[in-house]
Amino acid sequence: MIFQDNVIKEYLKNVYFITGTPCGGKTTVSRALAEKYGFELFDVDERFDEHKKMSNPLFQPAMNTYFNSADEFFGRTVEEYKNWLLNNTREQLEFVLLDLIRLSENKKVLCDCHLTVAQALAFSEPARVVFLIKDPSNLVDEYGNRPDHQGFFQYLNSATDIEKAKQTVNITLYLSLIHI
């Protein structure tokens, strides 16, 4: 079943989106605004495990891709890594939209997420979307130094060639900005 954009926009009229690059301040800003204005906060990253449990490898292959080691994960080409990252986000989006429709039926919701400009325009009016963009020069160290991303940083540091893994992540995150 496919829903037209105008239908999704109507059902998401109580949802405001804060999106953008990693380390751009999305979580900090969305939490502060949700608290200040009494909005329900929906953090897409916090829902990933829940959505993954509901996913099906046939329909959400990127969400269900497993890597045996940091070397396998970070050893992919930048193009492979970027495509996996974008596909992962796209596959989770269906779960996110349904959650947002349910949550926003009778209240305002602020969604901390990863949308492209095209997705944002398809699902919402421009006045309800904020993009926070960070200079991509060294995202991996900033990302890894955050308390909520220590697991990722430890995984990265378990790679055989840590500097190459960091470079792959930085380039991938930079190239994924093009899709924002």
Report residues per predicted region.
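P-loop (Walker A) phosphate-binding loop of NTP-binding proteins
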Residues: 21
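ATP-dependent NMP and nucleoside kinases share a basic, alpha-helical "lid"
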Residues: 111-155
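Walker A/P-loop
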Residues: 27
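ATP-dependent small-molecule kinase phosphotransfer cores
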Residues: 50-108, 114-115
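ATP-binding Walker
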Residues: 24
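Conserved small/polar residues in nucleotide/adenosyl-binding loops
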Residues: 178-180
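Hydrophobic anchor at the beta1->P-loop junction of P-loop NTPases
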Residues: 18
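Short beta-strand-centered segment that lines the nucleotide-binding/catalytic pocket of NTP-utilizing
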Residues: 39-54
